[in-house]
Design a protein with these regions (language model features):
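Conserved, short, structured surface segments that act as functional micro-motifs
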Residues: 102-108, 129-186
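Short, acidic/hydrophobic/Gly-rich beta-strand patch recurrent on exposed beta strands
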Residues: 64-67, 74-75, 103-109, 118, ...
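Zn2+-dependent peptidoglycan hydrolase active-site motif and core
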Residues: 86-121
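Short, well-structured beta-strand-loop connectors
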Residues: 82-90, 125-140
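Residue-level recognition of beta-strand microenvironments
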Residues: 55, 94-95, 123, 140-143
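Envelope-exposed proteins and targeting segments
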Residues: 48-50, 69-71, 79, 87, ...
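Short glycine/threonine/proline-enriched tight-turn/helix- or strand-capping micro-motif at secondary-structure
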Residues: 32-34, 54-84
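Polar/charged, compositionally biased leader and regulatory segments
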Residues: 3-55, 177-201
Length: 201
């Protein structure tokens, strides 16, 4: 039977030996937010185009080579692509989180749930801050257990005794462009930004 949820532990992102949060915090200018949908539906968490590379469910892990439950969805996008809050909420954790690499976990109310954004290259929020749906919180990267630039996105819901990750299902794909910018302009800007970065950065 296809499992639609899996128990998950706390993200525990934060200080780590040898890791300096300021080395990845607001290194580049923060992009403009996108319009939300009033928190009626999960907003697609990436500005611009992205390809779904791994769905929620059992999969052969590309690094460890074993069948493991994949507790979220993976979206491939160029490194540095802006990542937005899928719902309004409060930042629970922001920092280095084991296999998730540089990651953010947000908590949302009514109904209570959490969203997780993993393998980031840059952060724009810190624990305790509040964010609005569509606000840029980080950038796509390839940190942690990752085979290339992508966003690992999870939806977590409370269950007796803890939290479970659930299939996030369909995401709102409508407001994908930054306020005042069309999709083509945004993609050209992302391309120019990637060309200006020094090799290996």
């Amino acid at each position: 039977m296809y499992k639609r949820q899996v128990p998950v532990g706390a993200l525990l992102a934060g200080p780590s030996p040898g890791f300096r949060l300021d080395s990845v915090f607001a290194v580049s200018p923060r992009p403009a937010s996108v319009a939300g949908n009033g928190d009626r539906q999960l907003l697609f968490p990436i500005i611009g185009s992205a390809i779904t590379t791994s769905e929620f469910g059992w999969r052969l892990h590309p690094i460890v080579g074993q069948w493991l439950m994949h507790a979220g969805k993976d979206f491939a996008a160029p490194e540095g692509t802006p990542v937005v809050a899928a719902l309004s909420g409060r930042v629970l954790s922001s920092g280095l989180a084991g296999g998730y690499g540089i990651a953010i976990e947000l908590e949302h109310e009514l109904p209570r749930r959490r969203t997780l954004y993993g393998h980031l290259s840059e952060l724009y929020v810190k624990a305790g801050q509040t964010v609005r749906q569509g606000e840029v919180i980080g950038r796509v990267g390839s940190t942690g257990l990752s085979t290339g630039p992508h966003l690992h996105f999870e939806l977590r819901q409370p269950q007796s005794g803890g939290w479970v990750a659930k299939d996030p299902g369909d995401l709102d794909l409508n407001p994908l462009t930054a306020s005042g910018a069309d999709a083509v302009s945004l993609l050209v800007a992302q391309l120019m930004n990637s060309l200006e970065r020094p090799e290996g950065s």
